[in-house]
Amino acid sequence: MQEARRIRELPPYLFARIEKKIAEARERGVDIISLGIGDPDMPTPSHVIDKLVAEAHNPENHRYPTSEGLLAFRQAVADWYQRLYGVDLDPRREVVTLIGSKEGIAHISLCYVDPGDINLVPDPGYPVYNIGTLLAGGESYFMPLTAANGFLPDLGAIPSDVARRAKLMFINYPNNPTGAVADLKFFQEVVEFARSYDLIVCHDAAYSEITYDGYRAPSFLQAPGAKEVGIEFNSVSKPYNMTGWRLGWACGRADVIEALARIKSNIDSGAFQAVQYAGIAALTGPQEGLAEVRRVYQERRDIIVEGFNSLGWHLEKPKATFYVWAPVPRGYTSASFAEMVLEKAGVIITPGNGYGNYGEGYFRIALTISKERMQEAIERLRRVLGKVEF
């Protein structure tokens, strides 16, 4: 039987392709160093694991959870926002628990997008913004993120007829894949734009806590009026090394949160309650581990930037995320450069065109392996590339 058109038209998921390349190379006996997928390699804090173990022994947690999540977890999220950002959230109406923020990002279009509707999607950007749009029958209008504009979308360049048809605008800062950051002035411009065109802003803040050199990323919800026009997604995945635990949230505008909770109640049965209790421990417990996470990633960032600059690049150190976004050398496309370094150096990088057309000419490096393996990757590239030109 033929698959549905929505499946046939989906692009292959970027990271599934990368994982396949890694597996194939390792089957050939190649010692692969992966700078590709951004999956934290440090352990989850021990007090979080201990909480999971304790709650897993409670039979009450073996039953169906509520789709909107434990009130205690949503309260912990609200307290976290008040402590970090001074943002007030009603945990009952303005927070919903997610099975990882990716799940909510994929589902939010089902709440508002009908066939023929438009979502505003960053390019380059996390592929799920576009995929969720397509699954809902919508169309993506891609907002170019260019180095000349600090990898921020130029809101004034979006045609008014497109903006009037748009239902959702996805933004993501600190940004994957570019590592760019946004300030409250930009967020305020987004709020005014959303008001002008009656659209909903969906801010993906997954990397909000992965920051360096004393920089602290603002929340979109800190911008005056932001809670009237949008929501913010976040999770415990990156700051607490819990990507495999699948626990996140959306928070902000109450009617949007209610709509997302309604979709979830008809699609999934919520996150395992023991994991939610562990999430509470992560958000409310000791935070010294987060300081160490930042220190380790900052050290790795410096190794990558300084190492690639010694090969001829001119990279600046990103203020946030655990990615470095770099141009490909002269004579290569994103894909051809990634293929070459895999074949000749046994190093995986992520081609920028996997994040959209405006990612062409770039590649992404993830800082989620040990510094020793990073240094080895740089030396392998030195042997293969020599000194590069742009």
UniProtKB/Swiss-Prot annotation:
Principal EC category: transferase
Presence of keyword Transferase: yes
Residues modified as N6-(pyridoxal phosphate)lysine: K238
Reaction equation(s) it catalyzes: (2S,6S)-2,6-diaminopimelate + 2-oxoglutarate = (S)-2,3,4,5-tetrahydrodipicolinate + L-glutamate + H2O + H(+)
Similarity-based family: Belongs to the class-I pyridoxal-phosphate-dependent aminotransferase family. LL-diaminopimelate aminotransferase subfamily.
Pathway(s) this gene product operates in, as recorded in its UniProt entry: Amino-acid biosynthesis; L-lysine biosynthesis via DAP pathway; LL-2,6-diaminopimelate from (S)-tetrahydrodipicolinate (aminotransferase route): step 1/1
Residue sites binding pyridoxal 5'-phosphate per the record: S101, K102, Y126, N176, Y207, S235, V236, S237, R246
Keyword match Transferase: yes
Annotated PANTHER family: AMINO ACID AMINOTRANSFERASE (PTHR42832), L-GLUTAMINE--4-(METHYLSULFANYL)-2-OXOBUTANOATE AMINOTRANSFERASE (PTHR42832:SF3)
Species this protein is from: Moorella thermoacetica (strain ATCC 39073 / JCM 9320)
Top-level taxon of the source organism: Bacteria
GO molecular function, one term: pyridoxal phosphate binding
EC number annotated for this UniProt entry: 2.6.1.83
Cofactor: pyridoxal 5'-phosphate
Position of the signal peptide: none
InterPro entries: Aminotransferase_I/II_large, DAP-NH2Trfase_DapL_Desulfo, DapL/ALD1, LL-DAP_aminotransferase, NHTrfase_class1_PyrdxlP-BS, PyrdxlP-dep_Trfase, PyrdxlP-dep_Trfase_major, PyrdxlP-dep_Trfase_small
GO biological process: lysine biosynthetic process via diaminopimelate, diaminopimelate-aminotransferase pathway
Pfam families to which the protein is assigned, alphabetical: Aminotran_1_2 (PF00155)
Keywords, alphabetical: Aminotransferase, Pyridoxal phosphate, Transferase
Protein function: Involved in the synthesis of meso-diaminopimelate (m-DAP or DL-DAP), required for both lysine and peptidoglycan biosynthesis. Catalyzes the direct conversion of tetrahydrodipicolinate to LL-diaminopimelate. Is also able to catalyze the reverse reaction in vitro, i.e. the transamination of LL-diaminopimelate with 2-oxoglutarate to produce tetrahydrodipicolinate and glutamate. Can also use m-DAP instead of LL-DAP as the amino-group donor, and oxaloacetate instead of 2-oxoglutarate as the amino-group acceptor.
Residues reported to bind substrate: Y13, G38, K102, Y126, N176, R364
Protein name per the record: LL-diaminopimelate aminotransferase
Self-association state and partner proteins as the record states: Homodimer.
